[in-house]
C-alpha cells in the first residue's frame, strides 16, 4: 500500500491499519520509500513463514497476493502460478507439517487455477533437513571437471553449510544460514565423478541435501 496509496485493496483487509501522523522528517523519508515501492511488480513481493506449521499464514497470504495481482491486471490463472513461483516461502522442522502446508498451498492455488496440478510447478515450502547423516568423506567425489580453485571453494562452502545444518531440526527457525554461492554449489553437486558411482543421494542415508532453486 505504501507504493499505491490510492488502491482500494485495503477495503478488503480486515486488519489493515492506516498510517499514523509522522514528524516532517519521517514523512519525507517515507515519501522516498513510497517512490521505490511504486515501481515494484507483484512478482517482487516476497513472504516467508520460517515456522509455517500447516501453512495457515501462507494460505491467507495467497488470497491477499491474489488481490494484488488482480489489481495489477493479472488473470487468476496466471497469478496463481506466479504466486507459487515468486512470492511465498515456508519452512518447518516437522516433515508432517511440511506435507500439510504443501497440500494446503497447492489446494489454494487450484482454487484459482484448476489446471495447476497438471503441470510442473514450484511450491517453495520445505521441511528443514539435518546434515547429520551426510557422509562428508564422499564430498571428494564431487566437482568433477571443475578447476581446483572452484572445487576447493565449493567444498569449503558446502562443509560450512553442513555445519550449520547439524541438528537443524532442534534449532529450526533460529538457524542463521550464511549467504553462499549457490550457483557454485549446484554445479559442484551436479558434477559428480561417474567413475566413482557416487551421487548426493548415496552420500546420505535418509534424504538428500536440497540446495535453493533460482528465484
Name these PLM-found stretches.
Residues 1-211, 215:
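SAM-dependent methyltransferase catalytic region
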Amino acid at each position: 500500500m505504501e507504493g499505491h496509496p490510492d488502491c482500494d485493496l485495503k477495503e478488503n483487509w480486515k486488519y489493515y491499519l492506516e498510517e499514523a501522523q509522522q514528524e516532517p522528517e519521517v514523512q519525507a523519508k517515507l515519501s522516498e520509500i513510497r517512490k521505490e515501492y511504486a515501481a515494484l511488480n507483484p512478482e517482487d513481493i516476497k513472504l516467508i513463514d520460517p515456522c509455517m506449521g500447516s501453512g495457515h499464514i501462507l494460505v491467507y497470504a495467497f488470497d491477499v497476493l491474489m488481490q494484488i495481482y488482480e489489481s495489477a491486471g493479472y488473470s487468476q490463472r496466471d497469478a496463481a502460478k506466479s504466486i507459487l513461483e515468486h512470492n511465498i516461502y515456508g519452512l518447518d522442522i516437522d516433515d508432517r507439517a511440511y506435507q500439510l502446508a504443501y497440500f494446503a498451498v497447492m489446494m489454494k492455488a487450484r482454487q484459482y487455477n484448476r489446471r495447476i496440478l497438471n503441470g510442473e510447478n514450484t511450491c517453495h515450502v520445505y521441511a528443514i533437513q539435518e546434515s547429520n547423516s551426510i557422509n562428508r568423506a564422499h564430498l571428494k567425489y564431487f566437482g568433477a571437471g571443475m578447476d581446483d580453485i572452484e572445487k576447493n571453494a565449493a567444498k569449503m562452502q558446502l562443509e560450512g553449510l553442513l555445519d550449520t545444518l547439524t541438528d537443524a531440526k532442534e534449532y529450526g527457525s533460529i538457524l542463521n544460514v550464511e549467504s553462499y554461492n549457490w550457483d557454485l554449489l549446484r554445479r559442484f553437486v551436479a558434477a559428480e565423478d561417474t567413475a566413482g558411482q557416487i551421487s548426493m543421494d548415496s552420500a546420505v542415508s535418509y534424504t538428500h541435501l536440497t540446495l535453493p532453486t533460482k528465484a
